[in-house]
Amino acid sequence: MPTQPLVSIDAVPLVVHGGQLCVVTGLRLFEPFIGQAALPGVLLNGNERLEEAVKRALLSKTGINSYRFMVHTAVFDDFERDERGPTLSIAHLVILEQVPENDSVRVYPLSQLPTLPFDHNQIISQACAVLLDSLWVNAELTRALLGENFTTADVVARMKELAAAAGRAEPVVNNVGRALSSNKSIRKLDAVPQGTGRPPASWQWV
């Protein structure tokens, strides 16, 4: 009789920290990979919805109890992704407000991501691809990522970070400022002088 695969729910928590887009991980408490940083994940209970499982994974593995936005990204079904047996991973991207205060949390910029257990690097890469493709298409998700106020430089930085993490070519950003100017969902803020240089263009959601 074939082995029924288990269903794992894995979260990809992203947060802007120190001016960089980062992944929040927790330390594994059990084998395999005990003590190593990994994405927060749990096995789906029989009476549990996906969003409930994501929330449980975030709280139990990293202490995260709030977030700005959550969205499903992909399903990973490699039979060898977990040495303990066949599992399906249903991955969710989660945009956080801030880094959680928890000793078991490890935060890595996307540009400095180590090799994580299982297929977690692939899960992160796919989540970044989904987020990059959703910029300005999904206004709620874009707003969660950029915050209420942001600069053109912030948009450019996020685009480059996500493209690199997704394994894509560096995006063309020459016309980002012009595209922002024509977007009816945001408005340009009055420039605030900063020293002798030209102040960065700042934007706010309307």
Residue ranges and their predicted role:
Residues 1-37:
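N-terminal strand-loop-strand
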Residues 5-7, 51-55, 59-100, 134-142, ...:
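Active-site segment of metal-dependent pyrophosphate-handling enzymes
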Residues 23, 27-30, 34, 41, ...:
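Short, His- and charge-rich active-site/binding loops that engage polyanionic ligands
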Residues 91-93, 100-137, 145-159, 176-179:
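NUDIX/MutT-family hydrolases
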Residues 168-190:
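Charge-enriched amphipathic alpha-helical scaffolds
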Residues 186-206:
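Long, intrinsically disordered, low-complexity Ser/Thr/Pro-rich regulatory/activation regions
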